[in-house]
């Protein structure tokens, strides 16, 4: 009887050890959460994806990489898609043990209007409450790149570094996606000119005192590069760390290599 009891105890102990080992292995992997929250802006249900790095330890401080998707996409773009911009962002986040946050920000045609802006402010506040946040880098592609520049100009105190991949800095004169932008902003440029100017980074180069990296393509007809190239020249007196990756034969996309170079440049600049 005693022998049987001893065997049962040993089996229980072994099973607990195995369970703990599997638990440790699970924690060692990346963890993805689809997070829902009630927006302070209008009480609606909004979402973002949270990707915690392998071996995440909330006792340690972590940098945060916020990725803003392009027009017509949603919060899953930077988490799942094989585009160079998305792969590059995920690789850098994993390499540096960064918390990767990919918000809907009023998908699918956000353009960083008032609602999207308010959601992102709320998300950043929640992250700082939940985690030991070190630096926050805001990155976006296309519409998301435009949004990254807009948000940084509006809330420079919340962003430590910005990466814009094929975006525009001038929504006053940008001619594409007019209907979607008007819906996001609450009117056309003729109806609310001040709102378009307020959300155009080109008019606020002095706000960009943090490291900034932008990619552009000379043959990009979807989001022409001229306004971003102009912004970068205007930003140089205010920021010590400015990187322009301009591809003379490039279109409306950024390779994973260029994406990685841009993010790493900003991370290095933050170490100064």
Question: What is each stretch, according to the model?
Answer:
Residues 77-84, 167-204, 210:
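Mobile cap/lid helix-loop segments that gate and shape the active-site cleft of serine hydrolases
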Residues 112, 222, 226-272:
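C-terminal catalytic histidine-bearing segment of alpha/beta-hydrolase fold enzymes
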Residues 57-62, 68-110:
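Short substrate-entry loop that stabilizes the transition state in hydrolases
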Residues 126-130, 134-180:
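Primarily recognizes the serine-hydrolase "nucleophile elbow" in alpha/beta-hydrolase
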Residues 16-62, 182-183, 191-194, 242, ...:
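A domain-start/cap signature at the N-terminus of enzymes
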Residues 208, 214-216, 220:
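Short beta-strand/loop motif that positions the catalytic acidic residue
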Residues 111-130:
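Alpha/beta-hydrolase active-site loop
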């Amino acid at each position: 009887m005693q022998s049987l009891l001893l065997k049962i105890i040993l089996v229980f102990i072994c099973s607990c050890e195995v369970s703990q080992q599997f638990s440790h292995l699970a924690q060692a992997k990346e963890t993805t959460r689809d997070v829902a929250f009630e927006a302070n802006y209008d009480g609606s249900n909004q979402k973002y994806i949270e990707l915690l790095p392998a071996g995440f330890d909330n006792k340690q401080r972590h940098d945060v990489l916020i990725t803003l998707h392009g027009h017509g996409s949603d919060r899953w773009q930077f988490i799942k898609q094989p585009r160079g911009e998305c792969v590059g962002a995920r690789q850098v986040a994993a390499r540096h043990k960064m918390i990767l946050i990919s918000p809907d920000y009023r998908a699918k045609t956000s353009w960083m209007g008032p609602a999207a802006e308010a959601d992102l402010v709320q998300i950043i506040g929640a992250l700082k409450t939940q985690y030991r946040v070190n630096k926050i880098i805001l990155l976006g592609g296309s519409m998301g790149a435009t949004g990254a520049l807009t948000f940084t100009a509006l809330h420079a105190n919340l962003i430590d570094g910005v990466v814009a991949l094929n975006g525009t800095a001038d929504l006053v004169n940008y001619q594409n996606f007019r209907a979607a932008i008007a819906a996001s902003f609450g009117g056309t440029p003729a109806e609310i000119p001040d709102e378009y100017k307020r959300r155009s980074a080109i008019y606020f180069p002095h706000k960009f005192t943090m490291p900034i990296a932008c990619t552009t393509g000379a043959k990009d007809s979807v989001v022409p590069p001229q306004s971003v190239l102009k912004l970068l020249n205007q930003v140089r007196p205010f920021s010590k760390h400015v990187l322009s990756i301009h591809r003379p034969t490039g279109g409306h996309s950024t390779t994973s290599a260029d994406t990685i170079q841009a993010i790493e440049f900003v991370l290095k600049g933050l170490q100064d």
